[in-house]
Amino acid sequence: MSHEGSRQARDRGVTRSKAEKARPPTQPVPQVDIVPGRLNEAEWIAFMSLEEGEDVVGDILADLMTRVMECAFKVYLTQQCVPFTISQAREAMLQITEWRFLARDEGESAVAEDPTWGEDEEPLACTTDSWAQGSVPVLHTPAPVCVEEQFHNEEPGNPDQFLLGSSWDKESQKPTQPSEPSAEPKVTPRPTATLEAFEEAEPGDALEVPHGQEGSHMLAVPSKESLRSTAEGERVYSPQSSLKQPQVVRLQASEKESSFGSHLSLEDLYLCMPQPDAAGDRLSLQSKGQLHSSPIGSESHLGALTPAEPSAFQEPEVLGERPKHKTTTLRMDSSRLPRHWVRPVAEVLIPDLEVHPLEIYRGRPRRSQAGTATSACESQALSSRAPSKPHVSSPRFPLQRCATFRALGPDPSLNLAQTSPSFGSNVPFLSPGFRFLPRNPIPPDVASTPTPKLWPLAKWPSGWEREAEQLGELWAGRTRVPPQGQEPVEVTPLEEDSGWPLAAPQVLEATSQVLWKPMVISETMKLVPGVSMWNRGTQELLNPAVIRKEAEEGTPQAPEQQPIQTGVSKPQVIMKQIRNETPKAWLLPTKPVPHSGS
């Protein structure tokens, strides 16, 4: 047993030594440097374990500090609650007070001198020339020399003078040998100045012949009566000239007929015709029929009876030679001549226009025996058809006598009897002097009332006392004052009941008044001479500085006068009423005049 134990111990030693001899030698582990030569891996691991402990301690301290600061802030808010409420209330009260008392904004000062307020300069657009895209050159045809010379010689704005002077008398007048002046008056149908032109001229004035003659004849007009007397004297024919006169008239008619149809149209002739005036020119209906029937008849209306003058149309037996004719004539373009057309907004319709159109236009319709009987029958028929009603005296409100129909065109001399192209009817319009008169006359006690004191402080300039007093009487009593040289119109009972508008004489109209709200103080305004302003608040009439200066210096002023109001609103007619069978028109009420009493 002992032998076996020793053997085992010996075997173990042998095997251990063999194993140690067979095991390779262990190599040392190389060290990794984090920072070469300064910090190795073992030192880095030791530092990281130390920082982890510091981070844990820092988190614990931060949590503790946060809890302490929250408790301190809550205590601070509790202490500042009352002071904050007081400060907010103070600011609110100050803001409300500032809203109640607003300060005025003076704006910018010296804006004109500030360069930042100037307007930016904008370059001008280039003009379009012939090289622009889409531009087409236009060739203007030059007008004939004779037409341009006639336009320069004639006065501008007078188409009647150009038509009468260039187309009618140019052919008829030829330089002829002067013949012996005969004592026999001759009738030469050539266009001359109408009776209206002579009546408008004062005695002693000179009127120029419309057509352009080489001699430029000037006719001296001594007076209206002498002109009418000479015109009537020329209508008397002497027995010696009765044999030669038909030949002269026939020759002149043939010459006029050959040149008239090729130069002027019916429209041009209508423009050249003297229209009837509101003063009472007597143009019969027969002349209108002759105007449309033949050119010779229309020429007779345009022509006037003139004294015997050296004329181109004389008998061949007297002159010994035949008159020459112009071979080339120039045709005038009527579209190039200036025209005045009236385009009214509304047309006043009169039912009885077909019966007496010209009489209604002149103002007083002629009432013949047949017309009176017809009107009487019509009134009886209407009274029989209408049911009988008890007569109740009710106040009537007639239109004012001063209510005039204003002219619809800009030219005051333009006659409104001419038909407008916008209307197809031949209804003549009312003249500017046409007025509606009341159906019942005004009692004499009303007409004799004194002039009311409309404007107590109004002062009229010197030299207008009579006109102002007359206007005041017209406004106070609505009296009719006939013009100078005419008798007052007597209104018959038949005309009063007819209800038709009658023509009142021309009266002096005052300047229309305009109510307006000034944007500046009236005391600071400077009025130009001739302009006055009525202050309704102070009931004072503001005059220009020149009149005030005269009043302060003590110059004699006119007695206290009162201006009147003549501006009446125009009648307005709507389209629906024009289309109806029975037209209706009314006047809009005007604004009341202060202290007028009406």
From Swiss-Prot:
- Output this protein's name: Uncharacterized protein C2orf81 homolog
**What is the source species?**
Mus musculus (Mouse)
Polar residues composition bias: which ranges? 369-386, 558-569
Q: Which InterPro entries match?
A: DUF4639
Keywords from UniProt, A to Z, are:
Phosphoprotein
| Keyword Phosphoprotein belongs to the record | yes
Origin superkingdom: Eukaryota
Q: Where are stretches of biased composition, namely Basic and acidic residues?
A: 1-23, 225-235
Annotated region described as Disordered, given as residue ranges? 1-32, 151-190, 222-241, 366-396, 551-571
Q: Which residues carry this modification: Phosphoserine?
A: 238, 242
